[in-house]
Amino acid sequence: MSFSPQLVNLGNYLAGEFDNREQALGEPIWFVHLRLWQRPVDLFSDDSITLFAEQANIVNLDRPYRQRILRLMPAPDSETGLYVQYYMPKNPSALIGAGRHPDLLKTLTPQQLELLPGCVLSVSQQTVAPNSYQFTASPLPNTCCTFSYLENTVQVSLGFAVTETELHTYDKGIDQETGKATWGAIVGPYRYTKREQY
């Protein structure tokens, strides 16, 4: 299947190695210096572009966390719309370090992933210059992204905005009782700069 230019651009913009060095130096109280890897993987390739993502504190690059899969797809009810479906590895520890060592991803199969039904983002595209775009991903209305991790139920709010060189992430953990953010982009997005294209 051939992919739309919008889907190809979104995949290219999201694929790469990123960090938020400038933000962490400018606002060290609020933002840890992180490295984020988003590697293309050969899954669901008949209708999607799929990425493996994980991140690490810059001082602990050997201890990455938040392993996840982003499946970028055309929206079923739209000729131009896109959306992102999140998955979680059933055994995240088997993929620790795959951002830096992509050979670990070669044997990954769909059967090793858990679909996260409420963890879906709708993507809109805005032209910012000729052949240059910004994609903004927001949760679908009336959805709640929850999943089990280490025998706990976790709720997160997801979202991002990406251009060819920058990625802003709005992911944050939510306390299910109070509805308040407990970790992540509490005072604003993490502002990453792409350092390497994958």
From Swiss-Prot:
UniProt name for this protein: Phycocyanobilin lyase CpcT homolog
Induction: Induced by nitrogen starvation.
GN (gene name): cpcT2
Function: Covalently attaches a chromophore to Cys residue(s) of phycobiliproteins. In vitro is not seen to act as a chromophore lyase for ApcA1, ApcA2, ApcB, ApcD, ApcF, CpcB or PecB, the lyase activity is therefore unsure.
Similarity comment: Belongs to the CpcT/CpeT biliprotein lyase family.
GO MF, one example: lyase activity
Organism per entry: Nostoc sp. (strain PCC 7120 / SAG 25.82 / UTEX 2576)
HAMAP family: Chrphore_lyase_CpxT
Keywords, alphabetical: Lyase
Pfam annotation, one family: CpeT
S-S bonds: none
Record InterPro entries: CpcT/CpeT, CpcT/CpeT_sf
